């Protein structure tokens, strides 16, 4: 019976030893992520041109892996560049923040998204009210 009681704490410590590296890797990931966020914010404020080539590098890297599109790089990037330039300020930040499990970033992101959703909702309600009142008065 002594061996069984000794085996239980060993497995318990093994569980803790397995969970600690995961938490360490998460904190390391969050720390590196927050540093990259700060650098990207600084870059977007001071050097907006430095961020645009980085956003163009990602699509070209994706095209080179596909093979077919890498043969004609001159024809495919222009329409994609137009799409990327419109979303370049928002899209690179969203997926990276969502993947990080830092509670501070998640709360900030949720607050920003809620504000945007509420603003869109208010605009939609206002439009529908003005349309419905316009139809009734005419």
UniProtKB/Swiss-Prot annotation:
Annotated PANTHER family: NUCLEAR TRANSITION PROTEIN 2 (PTHR17488:SF0)
Pfam family of the protein (one): TP2
Residues that coordinate or bind Zn(2+): 12, 16, 26, 30
Keywords, comma-separated and alphabetical: Chromosome, Developmental protein, Differentiation, DNA-binding, Metal-binding, Nucleosome core, Nucleus, Phosphoprotein, Spermatogenesis, Zinc
Residues that span the membrane, as ranges: none
Motif (Nuclear localization signal): 111-119
Assigned protein family: Belongs to the nuclear transition protein 2 family.
Listed GO CC annotations: nucleolus; nucleosome
Chain's role: Plays a key role in the replacement of histones to protamine in the elongating spermatids of mammals. In condensing spermatids, loaded onto the nucleosomes, where it promotes the recruitment and processing of protamines, which are responsible for histone eviction.
Molecular function in Gene Ontology: DNA binding; zinc ion binding
Domain of life: Eukaryota
Organism (species): Homo sapiens
Region (Disordered), start-end ranges: 1-138
GO biological process, one term: penetration of zona pellucida
The protein, known as: Nuclear transition protein 2
Compositional bias segments (type: Low complexity): 45-72
Gene designation per UniProt: TNP2
Tissue distribution: Expressed by spermatids (at protein level).
Compartments (UniProt record): Nucleus; Nucleus, Nucleolus; Chromosome
Skewed-composition ranges (Polar residues): 1-33, 125-138
Residues recorded as bearing Phosphoserine in the entry: 133
């Amino acid at each position: 019976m002594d061996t069984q009681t000794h085996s239980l704490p060993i497995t318990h410590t093994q569980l803790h030893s397995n969970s600690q590296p995961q938490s360490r890797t998460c904190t390391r990931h969050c720390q590196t992520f927050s540093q990259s966020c700060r650098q990207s914010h600084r870059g977007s404020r001071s050097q907006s041109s430095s961020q645009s080539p980085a956003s163009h590098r990602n699509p070209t890297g994706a095209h080179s892996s596909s093979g077919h599109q890498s043969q004609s790089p001159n024809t495919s990037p222009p329409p994609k560049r137009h799409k990327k330039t419109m979303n370049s300020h928002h899209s690179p930040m969203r997926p990276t923040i969502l993947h990080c499990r830092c509670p501070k970033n998640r709360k900030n992101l949720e607050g920003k998204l809620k504000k945007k959703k509420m603003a869109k909702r208010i605009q939609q309600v206002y439009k529908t009210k003005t349309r419905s009142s316009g139809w009734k008065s005419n």
